[in-house]
Amino acid sequence: MAKEKIRVRYAPSPTGHLHIGNARTALFNYLFARHNKGTMVLRIEDTDQKRNVKGGSKSQMENLHWLGIDWDEGPDKGGDYGPYRQSERKEIYQKYIDQLIDEGKAYYSYKTEEELEAQREEQRAMGVAPHYTYEYEGMTADEIKQAQDEAKAKGLKPVVRIHIPEMETYSWDDIVKGHLEFESDTIGGDFVIQKRDGMPTYNFAVVIDDHLMKITHVLRGDDHVSNTPKQLVVYEALGWEPPKFGHMTLIINSETGKKLSKRDESVLQFIEQYRDLGYLPEAMFNFITLLGWSPKGENEIFNKREFIKQFDPARLSKSPAAFDQKKLEWINNQYIKKADRDTLLDLALNNLQEAGLVDEHPTPEKMEWIRQLVNIYSIQMSYTKQIVDMAKIFFEEAKDLSDEEIEEIKNDDGRGVIEEFKKQLDLIPRFTSVQIMNAIQATRKATGVKGRKLFMPIRIATTRSMVGPGIGEAMELLGKKRVVEHIDLTLKQMSENNL
């Protein structure tokens, strides 16, 4: 027996930018397809016209490509099972709507929104979960036709609802969650499969598309579990075999323990935001893959090829995945340390230009200086935009020392170390990082001060910071004139504070 050809899909709605949760769904489907040498389909689910954002699908596709996720069939690539936009498949859906109506498995419903809300209010008052009740109960076929003709005459537009069989169990063996089942009376009554404007509902269109596109596995978020029994109703009504379903766990905020919500402003949640900050796509790919999936062993840094080789949906977690910002920053820092220097330079240059610190067209000499600046900060950066704050001293006039910095250098040796270091700088032949370090060592010999009491006063006096890159490299980039100005300003402030 031939092995089943794996076909998966990622089916976003063009309602805005690419969210972390949606990126994870796309990524896991991509890894599953590539691991099994299967096919990845991109389908745009744009039937909800009110929520669609202009350019939304283009933005999402660009960000998927940036992450390193590609697909084999889709609106931009074509394929044997298109169109790949739901808005272009209306005639296809209508064919199956008509079939279900002809077979008596679906029907036109003319109940108005006001009537439906009144029904729900009545059910709530009775302590019953709101659900749709069949509006033609006890009526003959002729009576139903008469009621529908009268509704048409009033100009009412119908929806189409699908019959839900009574006392039936809908179940599936979920790839992630194991065996799940729902009773038909918990679905909420006959549900809408076509809206008043003629567009299909999500739970109908997705079944038609997945079947006709020969999708074998559906990996999606936990929030779709409640949609699955409705989709199984449609599969059963059409006599089709459903695909295998896998529902990935929620992503939660590691700080609050609550579900990651688009309203949670404590966490950046869109891929574009991380791109703008200077995160690397390989790092984002790595981090997102670990949100609800675990590789074998202790290592957490893998390239795409290694992830594809290892990916097994059996290792998808049943517990919520914690979005840990600090872990993301650590992972991105690991990639920054290994990144191509030109790539880092381009990202950091863009950040510096957006901050107004560097001209749009820097000279070759300035570019070389910026390259060195990026190199000395790369080991510290969690993302390249951090260089804007880290390296402010290189672009702005020196400010007075903070109370914390003054506290650090007001020891008995602080002033003496700074004054001696200034003398030693005048003795070095060239203002290079090597010669600067020689001046620091000469200061140590002359003062007898070493360790933190030696290095911290020098760092604070010259770079106006208690942390930073190698002190020699930093001073070389600042240049001797500015370093001496900083030292003089520090000594002046110390005198004013009687230090």
From Swiss-Prot:
Organism: Lactobacillus helveticus (strain DPC 4571)
Single Gene Ontology BP annotation: glutamyl-tRNA aminoacylation
Subunit structure: Monomer.
Superkingdom, natural source: Bacteria
Residues given in the record as ATP binding sites: 262
Name of the protein described by the UniProt record: Glutamate--tRNA ligase
The keyword Hydrolase is annotated on this UniProt entry: no
EC number: 6.1.1.17
Cellular localization per UniProt: Cytoplasm
Intervals of motif 'KMSKS' region: 259-263
One Pfam family, short name: tRNA-synt_1c
Gene Ontology molecular function: ATP binding; glutamate-tRNA ligase activity; tRNA binding; zinc ion binding
Family in the record: Belongs to the class-I aminoacyl-tRNA synthetase family. Glutamate--tRNA ligase type 1 subfamily.
CDD domains, per database record: GluRS_core
PANTHER family: GLUTAMATE--TRNA LIGASE, GLUTAMATE--TRNA LIGASE, MITOCHONDRIAL-RELATED
Keywords of the record: Aminoacyl-tRNA synthetase, ATP-binding, Cytoplasm, Ligase, Nucleotide-binding, Protein biosynthesis
Enzymatic class: ligase
The keyword Membrane is assigned to this record: no
Gene Ontology CC, one term: cytosol
Chain positions of motif 'HIGH' region: 12-22
Reaction catalysed by this enzyme: tRNA(Glu) + L-glutamate + ATP = L-glutamyl-tRNA(Glu) + AMP + diphosphate
SUPFAM superfamilies tied to this protein: An anticodon-binding domain of class I aminoacyl-tRNA synthetases, Nucleotidylyl transferase
PROSITE patterns for the chain: AA_TRNA_LIGASE_I (PS00178)
Role, per record: Catalyzes the attachment of glutamate to tRNA(Glu) in a two-step reaction: glutamate is first activated by ATP to form Glu-AMP and then transferred to the acceptor end of tRNA(Glu).
